[in-house]
Amino acid sequence: MGVTIESKNHYIDLGYGGFMCLRTKVAELAAPDIFEHYKKSIDGMRLYDENERKAFYKSYNAKIAELDRKYNGRMSDVLDFLYESDCSAEMDAAHCRSIYEVIKDYDDDISYGYSGRKDCAKFADFKKIVKDGIDSGDGFSWC
């Protein structure tokens, strides 16, 4: 079981680890402070004490809001992409435009999808989905 990201004309399949790596790369491309904060999200998953976990996420979420204010809303759509549920979400064409501005000049040869498959998802495949979301006006989704 994993994540399928799809637009009107394209799709990619990834495991949850690949999806996390993809979103981490988008965070890195967005801004250094967004990247550093996004990497800390995993820390909360390691907290077993309920009160510690609640305190961590209260502070963590406040920092997300602070970052959004720092960038005067220019990164709001990117932050939405980073923090939407792993299980199911939709990004409209406006979100696609914001994400595309961050990722358009980047490419790599990392396997984000299932490496044994001939259609293993790469970053270029994700860019096609985001661009298709803009061109079609339908955005993209994952589940």
List where the protein language model places each region.
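Acidic (Asp/Glu-rich) sequence patches and key acidic residues
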Residues: 1-143
